[in-house]
């Protein structure tokens, strides 16, 4: 199914746009420029088993100011998310693969546009955290590639070929 977001008003806006189709069903939001070694089947299974309100994928990056980032407490709970921070509190970037229950719709309706004029998914997830909802973080094992640029696509191709060659 293809659902058109009329204007680029943020990922939380995209979630609201899809709400009539999604209804009350849990769902995966997988940004198309992400590539994960091994896929997400194990994470989907964990989401179904543990039933958090949201599951987010994180990975350490050298340039966290270019991503949404997450802070975790000593018990590995999400305490704060910030979209493209000028002064990143951690190096844990949101990968762009999320699993949500219908609670994300209410959270997306409750937030206001960011300084970029968008409804940020990080703000909607933060709303869940702030209201005591369970947001489960998972650190990516294996490689992750954001393929938003040509050089990244070529690197992703090399990573996949290396994986195939190792089999």
Task: Label each region the model flagged.
Residues 77, 100-167:
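Left-handed beta-helix
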Residues 1-74, 100, 109:
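Conserved beta-loop-beta/alpha segment of the NTase-like Rossmann-fold superfamily
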Residues 73-92:
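A short, charged helix-loop
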Residues 87-99, 112:
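A short glycine-threonine-serine/GTX helix/turn-capping micro-motif
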